[in-house]
């Protein structure tokens, strides 16, 4: 049986070897997306083992059962030599009873691990399960979520490629449509995005990500700035109307002289019923003189049917909004996969059935050749990779202007490669969301505007221009005096006050 100190030594050795293997794994160059994903999963498995070993080691150092202390006292006491020979005797006795016991050093286990990485088996090359549509982590497969979305009540009917462009624009969906069925759709979409992220980016700490999303969401929810969920104002019955000082009135008849509208406004300010005749309103309002709202008869107050279940509805809305917040974050993380999915679906729709079959056969043969050759792709100019995972031709790279980078401050300093992607992004969700956060409509006036300061100044200029073009009755409305002279409204009013007409 291993001693406590030997267990601690073995755990320390395993931690160091795990750190060494993880460092080598991360430094190894990955030639394909499949290699990158498999490498990340191997690294995560070693990280999990590292955390498990660290936990075991901490428990041994805590020594809650006192065994470590007893062992230290035994080997450091006055009879240390007797303890040494006693343990040596136990070891010899063990090997006498088990003469064929094989002990594999830890170094051999880790060497086998490195060999398995350099020469992976067929099973090791497919560490994660992906659908055919997902292309081993290259594309998203949102067909089930799409079917769920188009079957929602009152949802607009759209095709799959349009859904890929707008499925994260949840802030555009009216609050009235965000019911229990909509919540189930969000849960389904979020579950897929979380599972896909776990498969494609296994090193992403989703617990830490959840805490970050929750903290940001709580802050925005309290401030009423979360997209699609503006802060609800309180009931009109508690804030509408104007209070009236009743100390200046000695009877309800005096109140009646104020008229129906003024009495209604005062009753609304107190949350009381505001209907009835002039006398009834005056009597109802006068009955509150010198009394607190708590002491008034409950029959005097207006019934607000919306107040029932308000707290429950608020909690339900908050749960739905939190699901949306998580979806926004995961879509941001999977932005590259989403863009590639959109292009892949477009390309498939533009091809005939025969061309699609040929493409699938080519992909199968290429994947087989990649597995056989496993060569590192030569890419000295750092060109973008095509749909086949290989660098695109340099002439095509220059033709599309992909060597030119465009930054957009409104999109959070996001970088777009090439003029085509840059021009297209003005109509996409990221730029539209940035403009919405600035409180500016994303119209044609703001095409090619990427700086926040430029957009704000242009919006102020447009508002001034619209204000100057607005019709002004004082100077533009015309009147005719008794002599037949045509003058504007302001001049006419001045002449009328002076009695010159």
Swiss-Prot record:
One of its GO terms (biological process) is U2-type prespliceosome assembly. The gene is SF3A3. This is Splicing factor 3A subunit 3. Pfam families: SDE2_2C (PF13297), SF3A3 (PF16837), SF3a60_bindingd (PF12108), SF3a60_Prp9_C (PF11931). The modification N-acetylmethionine is found at residue 1. Component of the 17S U2 SnRNP complex of the spliceosome, a large ribonucleoprotein complex that removes introns from transcribed pre-mRNAs. The 17S U2 SnRNP complex (1) directly participates in early spliceosome assembly and (2) mediates recognition of the intron branch site during pre-mRNA splicing by promoting the selection of the pre-mRNA branch-site adenosine, the nucleophile for the first step of splicing. PANTHER family: SPLICING FACTOR SF3A-RELATED, SPLICING REGULATOR SDE2. The modification Phosphoserine is found at residues 54, 121, 295, 299, 365, 367, 369. Belongs to the SF3A3 family. Residues 343-354 have a biased composition (Basic and acidic residues). It comes from Homo sapiens (Human). Residues 343-374 are annotated as: Disordered. Ubiquitous. The modification Phosphothreonine is found at residue 475. Keywords: Acetylation, Metal-binding, mRNA processing, mRNA splicing, Nucleus, Phosphoprotein, Spliceosome, Zinc, Zinc-finger. GO terms for molecular function: RNA binding; zinc ion binding. GO terms for cellular component: catalytic step 2 spliceosome; nuclear speck; nucleoplasm; nucleus; spliceosomal complex; U2 snRNP; U2-type precatalytic spliceosome; U2-type spliceosomal complex. InterPro entries: Matrin/U1-C_Znf_C2H2, RNA_Proc_DNA_Dmg_Regulator, SDE2/SF3A3_SAP, SF3A3_dom, SF3a60/Prp9_C, SF3a60_bindingd. Disulfide bonds: none annotated.
């Amino acid at each position: 049986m291993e001693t406590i100190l030997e267990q601690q030594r073995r755990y320390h050795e395993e931690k160091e070897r795990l750190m060494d293997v993880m460092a080598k794994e991360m430094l190894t160059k990955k030639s394909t997306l499949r290699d990158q994903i498999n490498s990340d999963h191997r690294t995560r498995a070693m990280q999990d083992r590292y955390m498990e070993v660290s936990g075991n080691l901490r428990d041994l150092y805590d020594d809650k059962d006192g065994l470590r202390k007893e062992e230290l006292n035994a080997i450091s006491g006055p009879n240390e030599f007797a303890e040494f020979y006693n343990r040596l005797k136990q070891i010899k006795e063990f090997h006498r009873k088990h003469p064929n016991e094989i002990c594999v050093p830890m170094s051999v286990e880790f060497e086998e691990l490195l060999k398995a990485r350099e020469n992976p088996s067929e099973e090791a090359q497919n560490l994660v399960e992906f659908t055919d549509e997902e292309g081993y982590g290259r594309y998203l497969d949102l067909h089930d979520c799409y079917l769920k979305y188009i079957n929602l009540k009152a949802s607009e009917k759209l095709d799959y490629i349009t859904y890929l462009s707008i499925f994260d624009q949840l802030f555009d969906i009216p609050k009235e449509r965000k019911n229990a069925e909509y919540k189930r759709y969000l849960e389904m979409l979020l579950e897929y995005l979380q599972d896909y992220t776990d498969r494609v980016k296994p090193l992403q700490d989703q617990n830490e990500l959840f805490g970050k999303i929750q903290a940001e969401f709580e802050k925005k929810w309290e401030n009423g700035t979360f997209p699609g969920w503006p802060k609800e104002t309180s009931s009109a019955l508690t804030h509408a109307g104007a209070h009236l000082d009743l100390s200046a009135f000695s009877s309800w008849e005096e109140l009646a002289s104020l008229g129906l509208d003024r009495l209604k406004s005062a009753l609304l300010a107190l949350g009381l019923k505001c209907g009835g005749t002039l006398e009834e309103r005056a009597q109802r309002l006068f009955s509150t003189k010198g009394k607190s709202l708590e002491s008034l008869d409950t029959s005097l107050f207006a019934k607000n049917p919306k107040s029932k279940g308000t707290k429950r509805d608020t909690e339900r809305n908050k749960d739905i909004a939190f699901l949306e917040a998580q979806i926004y974050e995961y879509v941001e993380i999977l932005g590259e996969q989403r863009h590639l999915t959109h292009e892949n679906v477009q390309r498939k729709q533009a091809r005939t059935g025969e061309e699609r079959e040929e493409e699938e056969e080519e992909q199968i043969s290429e994947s087989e050749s990649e597995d056989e050759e496993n060569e590192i792709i030569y890419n000295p100019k750092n060109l973008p990779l095509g749909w086949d995972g290989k660098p695109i031709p340099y002439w095509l790279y220059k033709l599309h202007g992909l060597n030119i980078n465009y930054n957009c401050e409104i999109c959070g300093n996001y970088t777009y490669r090439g003029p085509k992607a840059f021009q297209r992004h003005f109509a996409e969700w990221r730029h539209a969301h940035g403009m919405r956060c600035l409180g500016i409509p994303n119209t044609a006036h703001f095409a090619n505007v990427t700086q926040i300061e430029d957009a704000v100044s242009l919006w102020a200029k447009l508002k001034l221009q619209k204000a100057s073009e607005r019709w002004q009755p004082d100077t533009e409305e015309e009147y005719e005096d008794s002599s037949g002279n045509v003058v504007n409204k302001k001049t006419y009013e001045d002449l009328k006050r002076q009695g010159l007409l």
